[in-house]
Each structure stands twice: as structure tokens, then as C-alpha cells.
Design a protein with these regions (language model features):
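Extracellular, repeat-based ectodomains that mediate carbohydrate processing or recognition
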Residues: 1-233
Length: 233
């Protein structure tokens, strides 16, 4: 995830195991990218944690890196075999983290999978959106898990006002589910727009495009942009 002369990435010095993967930031100097600055202060001592995805944005003054982490059984590294229960437990442990100008904050701490953050920054403010599962994946059966994958995921967000992050909240209170893809932009006055393809049906043509407006951390409106038989993805 690049923004101007800086970018964020997942980085490992060794690639020997999942726990060696961390978020990192590299900057461009004289046309060359520097060796990534690896961020490790997010880790919990005694836990095997890894990073799945990162996003990054900056307005020059404010630099925000967002990522999701997961706790996994260290046996996964040793035997290479992962059963569905282990995998679900790993996903279920996923949480959202942010670094603001190098300062770490954990945004979520719950019993559902929070994954794939997207971040926007403008004029000293920021917003992060991510997908959140409806179910506790570790305690659900195969049929419910399939339903979840078909479209039960919701979109959450947290807003940074220049000092603090707001408590995570669902867009549209979670009533519209089935997050397939999403992106976010932030204007100079602190108004954010989230654009998402949503739809809880397993049929692609049932998915539609929605926009959400968030002003100073509070959701103001939701609009259904499409209503047709085409699959907006």
C-alpha cells in the first residue's frame, strides 16, 4: 500500500515462520526505497501472531498504517497441516490495529474475525474501515460458515479526529450485510465516503453498490447506488 514517497507492507527477515511477519514502512529516498522499518510494538508477549493485510495513507503530516493480525497455533508452522477448526480459530482471533505517526492502537478486541482494513487520511483526520464476521467462526458448523462466506460479513469503521479513535461501529448498524469489496475516501472537512458492494445472496446479480457518508465520526446517510440484475463487484 503506497502513498507518495512512503508505503506499507508485510515484511519478514527470515520467512522461517508466520510469527516473523510484521507490518513495515519504507520511504523513497533519491529514487530508491529504503529498507523497511519493521513495527513490532503491537505484539503480545507469549502469543504466536502474524499479519494478514496492511493499508497505508498519509497527508504529509499524518501517517496512518492499518493492519489485521491473527493468533495461530505454532503447530501450523511445524507440520504444515491445518484442519478447519484450527483455521476458523485463527480467523476468529483477527483484530484491527493502527499506527498513527508511529503510535500503536488496537481498535478491536472481540470474538469475531475483523479483517482487511482500508484507510484514508486528510487534513489531520483519518478513517479506517474493515470487514467483520457475523459469527464466531470457531463455534459454528460448516453450513453456517458457508453462509458467512456467501455474504454475512458487515463493514465496520473507526474515525480519528486528530487525537483519538472512535469506538468501532457498524455502517448502517450492520443491517446491510454481505461485504464483497469496499474503499474509503476522506475530504478536507472530515467527511468520509465509503463505497461498497454488498449483498447477502450467493447469487452475484443480487449484489448492489452502496455509498455511506460519515461526518466527524457519525454516520449521516446510506444510499443504494445500483438496483439491477448485474453483479456489482
Amino acid at each position: 500500500a503506497a502513498n507518495g514517497n512512503s508505503m506499507a507492507l508485510t515484511y519478514s527477515d527470515t520467512l522461517e515462520d508466520l510469527v516473523s511477519i510484521n507490518p513495515a514502512v519504507s520511504t523513497k529516498e533519491s529514487g530508491e526505497w529504503t529498507k523497511p522499518e519493521v513495527l513490532t510494538s503491537w505484539r503480545t508477549e507469549g502469543k504466536s501472531e502474524t499479519v494478514n493485510s496492511v493499508d497505508y495513507a498519509s497527508d504529509g503530516r499524518l501517517k496512518v498504517l492499518a493492519f489485521d493480525s491473527a493468533v495461530y497455533d505454532s503447530d501450523i508452522d511445524s507440520d504444515g497441516n491445518v484442519d478447519s477448526k484450527e483455521l476458523n480459530a485463527t480467523f476468529n482471533s483477527s483484530e484491527i490495529h493502527v499506527y498513527v505517526n508511529g503510535k500503536h492502537t488496537t481498535l478491536t478486541a472481540n470474538n469475531v474475525a475483523d479483517m482487511a482494513p482500508e484507510v484514508a487520511v486528510n487534513n489531520g483526520k483519518a478513517i479506517v474501515v474493515w470487514q467483520s464476521d457475523t459469527y464466531n467462526l470457531a463455534d459454528t458448523d460448516a453450513e453456517t460458515l458457508q453462509k458467512d462466506m456467501m455474504g454475512e460479513k458487515k463493514i465496520c469503521y473507526s474515525y480519528y479526529d486528530g487525537t483519538d479513535w472512535s469506538a468501532p461501529a457498524y455502517l448502517e448498524r450492520g443491517e446491510i450485510k454481505g461485504a464483497q469489496a469496499y474503499d474509503v475516501a476522506l475530504s478536507d472537512d472530515g467527511t468520509a465516503m465509503v463505497l461498497a458492494t454488498m449483498g447477502s445472496s450467493e447469487e452475484v446479480q443480487e449484489r448492489e453498490l452502496y455509498s455511506y457518508i460519515v461526518k466527524d465520526g457519525a454516520q449521516k446517510s446510506v444510499n443504494r447506488i445500483t438496483c439491477n440484475d448485474a453483479g456489482e463487484t
